[in-house]
Swiss-Prot record:
Catalytic activity: 6-hydroxynicotinate + NADH + O2 + 2 H(+) = 2,5-dihydroxypyridine + CO2 + NAD(+) + H2O
Taxonomy, superkingdom: Bacteria
Example GO BP: catabolic process
Residues reported in the UniProt entry to bind FAD: G15, E34, Q35, H47, R108, L130, D293, A306, A307
Residue numbers annotated as active site: H47 (proton acceptor), Y214 (proton acceptor)
Signal peptide stretch: 1-26
Family: Belongs to the 6-hydroxynicotinate 3-monooxygenase family.
Protein name: 6-hydroxynicotinate 3-monooxygenase
Cofactor binding summary note: Binds 1 FAD molecule per subunit.
pH dependence: Optimum pH is around 7-8.
PANTHER family, A to Z: GERANYLGERANYL DIPHOSPHATE REDUCTASE, MONOOXYGENASE
Cofactors demanded by this protein: FAD
Length: 383
């Protein structure tokens, strides 16, 4: 092997892009491979808590995110019918003073575009769908659908819930359908809301379903909602299907007038299955390591799924900087030791869908700083 060890990141979602950006800034020889032909502004929003914004500071896009995003003063939880306040979690200025970074909501596509723009030229390659993986003691060979073959000494699987690299490590297994779907819609903020309580960030709760609503721009001219609604079956051959205003009316019949107004203002809505996996017995083997949904997919009910992938990427970069890449097995063990317990906790709480329904202390989540956490060894077995 000549020159620096080569790192290949498979999957340019939020976790993979963050990892490639951080590793490039740290001086590693990294390439990022994405199966899509290009990116578009997909219709979804995202929460970026202080735990993520501190990582964006390292990538160099914190200020622009703060300009583009919406900064809610509180996370509200409300009763589905009466609108009564169930919880009010301070964010806004409190997040800055207490956690050391902002809490914002933003359009997922805008966030992804900023991270992608932070990558060095030529690092990201599109139209790279992974079809086969060969490995020996010294190198991993990545075979793509376009006929190309790339080699790397380290391969990072950031390729999502249906990860090809997870399948290579552990065998083929479909993720679990949880019995819930998420309806998603992004659209211009209704102008005729009158006196209805359009909170900047609110989750409406009933016993068996919910709707999370927030602005995705600093101008508050675009609003997003995502639901959790029970649905007995899902065709696992489909990643999503169109929904409709009629389906939304039926799912949320009798809900508060604010929810009804949002439904009536919805031009288009899609429906997605909520998928999970049991915690994996391993996150790495040989020269391959997983991050994000490839190893711990979760329901979105804490708004922390992407955050966990980004934290994984930051921790892996931090450990590579500390240990170097020659003893990759030791680096991977240290990564699991310092990520598996937290990711599993977030996965459990997300599954239970109890997060911030009452006035609880979110410090363990929002106050986490991947760069300040003391590194520990041997904790993986306890996760």
């Amino acid at each position: 092997m000549q020159g620096k060890p080569r790192i290949a990141v498979i999957g340019a979602g939020l976790g993979g892009t963050a990892g490639a950006a951080l590793m490039a800034r740290a001086g590693f020889n990294v390439r990022l491979y994405e199966q899509a032909p290009a990116f578009s502004r997909l219709g979804a929003g995202i929460h970026l808590g202080p735990n993520v914004m501190k990582i964006m500071r390292r990538i160099g896009i914190e200020d622009e995110l703060n300009r583009q995003g919406s900064h809610p003063d509180y996370w509200y939880s409300r009763d589905w019918q009466s609108g009564a306040e169930l919880a009010r979690i301070p964010l806004g200025d409190y997040a800055v003073s207490h956690y050391g970074a902002t809490y914002l909501t933003v359009h997922r596509g805008d966030f992804h575009a900023l991270m992608t723009a932070a990558l060095p030229a030529g690092l990201l390659q599109f139209n790279k769908r992974l079809t086969r993986v060969d490995e020996d003691d010294d190198v991993v060979r990545l075979h793509f659908a376009d006929g190309s073959v790339e080699e790397a000494e380290i391969v990072i699987g950031a390729d999502g819930v249906n990860s090809r690299l997870r399948e290579h490590l552990l065998g083929a297994e479909l993720p679990k359908y949880t019995g819930y779907v998420a309806h998603r819609a992004v659209f211009p903020t209704p102008l005729d809301s009158g006196s209805l309580p359009f909170d900047m960030c609110v989750k409406w709760w009933s016993d068996d379903r919910h709707m999370m609503v927030y602005f995705v721009t600093g101008k508050r001219d675009e609003i997003y909602y995502v639901t959790g609604v029970p649905e007995q079956q899902w065709d696992m051959g489909k990643s999503w299907v169109p929904s409709s205003k009629a389906e939304m009316r039926a799912a949320f019949a009798g809900w508060h007038p604010t929810v009804q107004a949002l439904i009536e203002a919805t031009p288009e809505v899609s429906k997605w299955p909520l998928l999970e996996r049991d915690p994996l017995p391993l996150w790495s083997r040989g020269r391959i390591v997983l991050l994000g949904d490839a190893c711990h997919p979760m329901k979105p009910h804490m708004a922390q799924g992407a955050a966990m992938a980004i934290e994984d990427a930051a921790m892996l970069t931090r450990i590579f900087e500390q240990t170097g890449l020659q003893d990759h097995a030791a680096a991977f063990r240290l990564y699991e030791d310092n990520r598996a317990e937290r990711a599993s906790r977030v996965q459990r709480v997300s599954h239970d869908n109890t997060w911030l329904r009452t006035n609880e202390n979110p410090d363990w989540c929002f106050g986490y700083d991947v760069y300040a956490e003391p590194l520990v060894e041997g904790r993986r077995a306890a996760a």
